Structure formats: structure tokens, C-alpha cells
Amino acid sequence: MSDINTESGESTSLPNSTDPPLSDVNIDVEDDDTAESISSLQPIVSNTTNPPEEPINPVLGQYHQACQKGDLATVKQLLDSGVLDLNTDLTGDITGLHWASINNRLSVVKYLISQGIDVNAKAGDLEATPLHWAARYGYVHIVDCLLNKGADPTMCDMQGFNLLHLAVNSSNVMLVAYVLFFVVAKGIIDIDCQDPKGRTPLLWAAYQGDSLSVMLLLKFGASTKIVDEGGFTPLHWATVKGQPYVLTHLIRDGADFFLKTNDGKDCFTIAQEMNTSHSFKDALSICGFNQDGYPKRKLFKKSDHAKVITFFVPLVALSIIFILFTHLHPLFALLISLIFGLAVNKALKELILPSYSNYGLHSTSLLKSPFLSGTFFGSLLLLTIVWIFKIAPFTIFKSRLLTNFFMFLILMQIYYLFIKLIFSDPGCVPIETDHENVRGTIKELLDTGKFDIKNFCLETWIRKPLRSHFSTLNTHNVARFDHFCPWIYNDIGLKNHKNFMWFILLTEVGIWFFISLTMKYFDILEDTNEDVACFLLGDDELCAGFVYDRFTFLIALWALIQSVWVGFLIVVQVFQTFTGVTNKEFNKYVKEKKNQHAFDPIFFNDTFNTTPEELRNDDDDTAASRTGNNPNHSNGTTIPSEGSRINTRKPRTCFNLCFAITGLDQVRTIVRETLGIGGANEMSRMQLLSSIPTNYGWKRNLADFWLTSDVMAPIWRRLFYSPVESRALLNGVEVDYFKLYDFPEKTYPEPTGPESV
């Protein structure tokens, strides 16, 4: 059964289609605010253990039980034999169609409708139709079938709830999406329809903390201004719940947080009383307001101007820090640099970042800004200046002409790739805006039993291609998404992944060319100056560089440090291209492997899939088992609130943050999961690699990644050029990654000898 709780962190949950059928219940809800709030989420409540006053007909009992269990053969036998008449199918006004609908028995529903049963029959004290019963539990396929067979979506139960109200109360966002596109978009139901208490679907979604439904309702133009009989707007009820994403959606849409209820309470007062002030103030900050609800002061009218400043700040900061270490004692330079760094960080957060246009659900951070890409650019520019004005003049005629020439070529290529990657299209899948096309997509997914958020994108209204991921930076699904790279301030995907590989390879090679030339330069300094000795560096060329050109020494040291994490990044990327997997996919497979045998008393159906058993296939069951969404469990269909997620997530330390930025966390995962260092056994490692559906063998994987699908082009062009459109190789076959819904099958040759990876 479903439940609702106003405490932050709780979420509604719905039974899976494989739950035991509901029977021996009585629909009886008291007419008060609490009962009304709960009744739509608990449509069928056993309030009494008293048996019916008159004995149940054994034939009707057998028939209803068959409808509940989905026993189509028994239903057909009873109706075909004539022992049961659909017109007398009553047990307390509850028909077999009601029982089949609320238990997600699609085949029984279709058969009963084909036999002429009344699809709008009312049942129970609430006088609810089968459509209402199915909607309360979020069963999209049943709702679709009933609507196609004449069920009236405008009918209300005794509580005044219509199809849209009940869809929202089910907390199944896929049903909400279906009703919005197939009913609301056609003008059959008003998006702002109110129940007898004046509560709109948006108000109910806000009260439940259902951020996905709130997002969809707002996309369809739901009003944030309408108040219920108590003077509460959706934002007031969202403040009661305290779900930060819901608050952010509503405030960004223009909800008035100063508006007072009939009791004279605004959102600030409600947040304080309900202990949700932290979530409310965070939402205000994300939407550009201070803690008092007034717009933050912005230094820049355009977000792009603030981003340009953020990009160039690291260049200035690095220059100052290197100058400090060049002319001051290292301890004093370190102290001043720390103070200076904290001041820069504070200035950026307080003065620059508020000018960003934030369309996401989280506050803008330096990690999600051009700051790190500016750090790379500043480092590269300082290295270039040192090479041009200090190193090249001394080494170009000292048997290092060819090395300097290659250094020039590498630097030019790095600059070119860096700029190209920043402005590149990672492979954004076009957004769908035509409602008719969206309805066609939904119908297709319903027919295949794949109408869930794993296959349908709620943000862009498209069928999600395999290997794609929605990017908040680009606000599109990115085909063959790998990861977001803060060093180029862009996503890495199908269209720019190969350029990214060339970029990091050339960066690593360029650093070592620079180190080689720097050592030659220091050797010249040692020969042309007095001999000196250093405490840790000895008396060779390193000491000469430190004493006679400390700025160049520091730049070389900084470059050497960067080469370490770039090298690890190359290892990760090469490993993943060998195994035919992206960064995001590998992390997902590792997580699934860890959770495969974990027991959790609460299983969340985070894909919102309510496909009836009749439409499921073996692949669906296998996938559900791998992801923890086993249909044999009573899964909820509401994603836990952000508050509950944060409470169960380990806090990220500074050490872990540095690991994530430099990619060392990926190296650690690869070493542990594939080399067996850290606990993974041989069988576990082989299971992980074999579970990757895009791993077709290392030779095939490399060819798929490095060669374009244009087989008529020269081999050099296929190697160095990235995919221009959405087509690329997968298992040697050209596929359209914008419409990739099935993987090419793996072929397993007959073993004739020792198998190779």
C-alpha cells in the first residue's frame, strides 16, 4: 500500500504489479482533511474486519480472485460457461474489472472489455471507476487500455479527484507524463483542475515532494499562484514537505514566497515551524535570492561575462603565486599564497558566481564553472611564455633544434584541441517539442514494456538512446556520454571523445618535451654560472635552475605534477577503450556488481516501470535483477528525497575531492575491480568484464572507437577525424547513436585454443 508522511526524507511508495491481489477490503474514508490527504494514496484501505452482511456467491468469489491473480483461463471459463453474467458482476459494487485494474492484470482487463463490461462502472463508497483504481496505483498500461476503450477521464470520485489528481497522487511520474500528453494536452482536463478543497495537481505534487511530477506540470503551464481553501499555494505545501528540488522548481517558476496563507503565514514562517528552513534557503540561493528573499546583487548582466572572468582569474592567480615563490622565502610565499587563494575563492563565490544563469537544481560551484579549464589554460600559457622567452633561445642552437620544433607543433595542436573541445558539441541528441511525436514515442514504449525513465527522458521528451545521459550543462541527452570534464568545461561524448583522447595524449607528450628542454636549459645555466649546492637538489643542473631561474624551475615542477594525473587519466581512458565501455558505464557496472547481493529492506523502483507481467520478457527480468529493480520485490515508485539520499551518502573529504578532480578515483576503481587488488577475485573480475554489453573484444573495441564509420574514407581520415553526425561503429556495424535502442549481438567463435582477452 502507499503511504505519505510530511517529514522530510520520506517518500511515497507503490506496490509492484506482482504484489498479492487486493481482496476482502472495504472502501470507507472519513470526510476530513487527513483522510482526504491519504485516501488518494491509499485508495483501498481495510478499515473493518467485519464480513459482508450477505454471503458472497462462491462463483463470484472465484471469478474475482481470478481477476485479481490474472488467471485469464478461469475468467474465460466462468464467462463462457454462462454461470456468470457480467451485468450481475457485483460484490459491494466492485466489479472484476476493478480488481483486474488495481492488480495490473492487462490481459484480463482487455478480455473483460471485449466482453462488453462497463468501463465506467463506479464502485465502493468513493464511487470510483476502474480508471480511478488503476491511476491510484500508477498503472500506466491499464490506464492506457481503459482510455482507449472509452473510459471517461473527466469523471471524479466522491472526493472530487479526477484522473490527473490520482495520477499525481500515485507518485508515478510516468503516469503523470502519460496523462499530460494524452489527456491534458488535448484539452480534456485542465492542468489546474481543483478538487473540492481547491487543491490542484501541482499542489498535490508539491505536498508529496514529487520533484519530477512538479517539473512536468510546470512544463505544461501549471500555475503556482492558485491557492486552496486554506490559502496555501503549491510553494507553501512544498515548504511543509521541504523537498529541495520541488522548492527550486517552484521558486524558479515565479512562485511568491512572501504570499501569506489564511492564517497569516508566509513560506519563511512555515519553513521555521516545519524545520525545513535549510532546504528553503538553499532553494532561494540556487534561484538567485538571498536568505531574506530578495534578488542577489549581480556584477554582470550576462552570465557569459561572468564566465569569462572566471576563466581568466586562474591565469592571474597562478602568475602571482609563482612570482611570490620566486622572490620570497618558500614559507612566507606559501602563507601568502594560501591567504591569497582563500581570498580569490571567496571573491569568486560572492561576486562572480551569483551572476551565472543557473538552470540546474544545485548551487553553482567552482567545479562546475570554467575555473579549472582556466587553470589549465593559465598553466599552458605560462609554460608557453617560459619556453618562448627563456628556454628556446638557449636550447634551439644547442643540439635541440628538432626538439624545439616538435615542441612548437605540439603546443599549437594542444591550443587548437583545447579551444575546439570547449566549444564542441559532445553529441547532443535533438530535443522533441512536437506533442504528436512524443505521443508516438510513448505508445511505442508502452507496446514494448519500456515506458520508464530509463527509456524516456522527462527533460527532453525523447526516447533515450542507449549509452546516452542527460547533461545539465548542455541541457540535452549526450550520445555515448563518457563524463563531464571540468578541465575543458564540457561533456565528453560521441562527437568529441576522440579529440579528447588526442588532447590528453599530446598534453602528456608535450610536458615531457618541455621537461627535457628545461633540463637542457638548466644544464646550460650550470655551465655558465658559478657552481652552487642546494640542500635537497644537490649540485647539478636542478640546483642551478632553482638558484638562477627559479620561475622556470617552478613552472617545470608544476608541469611535472600535472603530468602525473594526466598520465593516470590516459591509463583510465585507454583501459575503457580497450573494454568498449565509457567512464559512466563502467562506474555503473561496478556499482551494480557491488549491490547485486546486497540486501536492503526497501527497494526503490527508480525507473517507475509498472509494465504488466504479460508484456515482460526475459531480458527485462534480467535487467531488473542486475539493477536491483527485481519485479518480485514490492518496489516503491518514488525516488527518495534528496534529504534522505544525503543522509546515507558518505561525506566527500578534501582528499576524495582531489581524487575525483584528477581522475585518480577511476584508477583506483579499475585496479581494484579488474586487477584484483583490493578484494575482487578472479571470477568477480571476469563477471564484471563479461557483463559489459559493448565489450566485443579489445581489437574490435579499439576499431570501433578510433575509426569512423565512413568505410570509403582514407584510413588516416577515419583515424584522426571525429564522427560528424550521429553515426559510428559498434561491433563493426554502423549504428545511429541518436537512435540506438538495441546493441549489436555478440558473436562467440568456437574455441580452438587458449582464449585471449
From Swiss-Prot:
> What residue intervals traverse the membrane?
308-328, 332-352, 376-396, 403-423, 499-519, 551-571
For the Cytoplasmic compartment, the record's topological domain ranges are 1-307, 353-375, 424-498, 572-757
What is a biological process (GO) this protein takes part in? regulation of endocytosis
Where are the annotated segments for Disordered?
1-54, 614-647
The subcellular localization recorded is:
Early endosome membrane; Golgi apparatus membrane
Q: Where is the active site?
A: 485 (s-palmitoyl cysteine intermediate)
Molecular function (GO) terms for this protein are: G-protein beta/gamma-subunit complex binding; protein-cysteine S-palmitoyltransferase activity
Under the heading SUPFAM superfamilies, the entry gives: Ankyrin repeat
Q: What is its EC number?
A: 2.3.1.225
Positions annotated as ANK repeat: 58-88, 92-121, 126-155, 159-188, 197-226, 230-259
This chain's function reads: Palmitoyltransferase specific for casein kinase 1.
What is the protein's given name?
A: Palmitoyltransferase AKR1
